[in-house]
Amino acid sequence: QNIELCYHKSLDGLPDSLDLIIIATNSSVRSDVLKNATRKRSVKNLILEKVLFQKKIDYISVDKLLKKSSIPTWVSCWMRTTDLFKQIKPLLNLNDCIQMKVEGSKWGMGSNSIHYMDLFSYLSGCNDFKFTEVHLEDEVQDSKREGFKEFTGRLKGGNSRGDSIDLICQDEQDGPITIEIQNSPERFTLATNFVNHFEFKSSNLFNP
């Protein structure tokens, strides 16, 4: 099957009707791109990269736009879609609390915490999450993306079920990120480089 790829320098070159738009621009311009695209074209579905926006007003205005237009929209939080976590979820006993801990060095706490927050919500089946303790380092660092910043430290939070999440990002040499999921009596430990897991341990000999 032949697939034709077309490259355009502006929205004006795109077809009038689009089944899907993926907006993976920097967060500083994403709101403008989204508004222009939905104003100029008929859009059936949207996928947005995180972090969504840099300004609170953008969240409010885009939320109103999407509700008015009824365009189905997703944020790219991919961890819940992986086979590993899909297999772990049914092994958890939701009659007991889930304790999730993420620890590593320079994993981009400012931009990537959302992935672990979403995974926590997926595994617990509870979306009313909030941080209860914030312990960030004073020094703000330059992000790998020019003009953006990152930070390190520790964030602790939970939900109404009593589940807890502990995010630790250290300012040390790059190394693996450890994800530990405790749900008595089960314990799952994953060492990852964020994209691919390369070491996995389970208390019940579960082997994905």
Language model features: what each stretch is:
Residues 3-47, 51-65:
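Beta-loop-alpha module in the N-terminal Rossmann-like domain of NAD(P)-dependent dehydrogenases
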Residues 41, 69-70, 95, 124-127:
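A structural signal for short coil/turn segments at secondary-structure junctions
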Residues 26-29, 52-53, 79-81, 171-174:
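Short beta->alpha connector loops
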Residues 12, 20, 52-117:
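A contiguous active-site-proximal alpha/beta segment in oxidoreductase catalytic domains
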Residues 22-23, 46-48, 73-76, 166-168:
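Short catalytic-loop micro-motif centered on adjacent basic/acidic residues
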Residues 99-175:
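Rossmann-like dinucleotide-binding domain that binds NAD(P)(H)
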Residues 7-9, 48, 75-77, 133-135:
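Short loop/edge segments at beta-strand edges and connector loops
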Residues 157-208:
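NAD(P)-dinucleotide binding in Rossmann-like oxidoreductases
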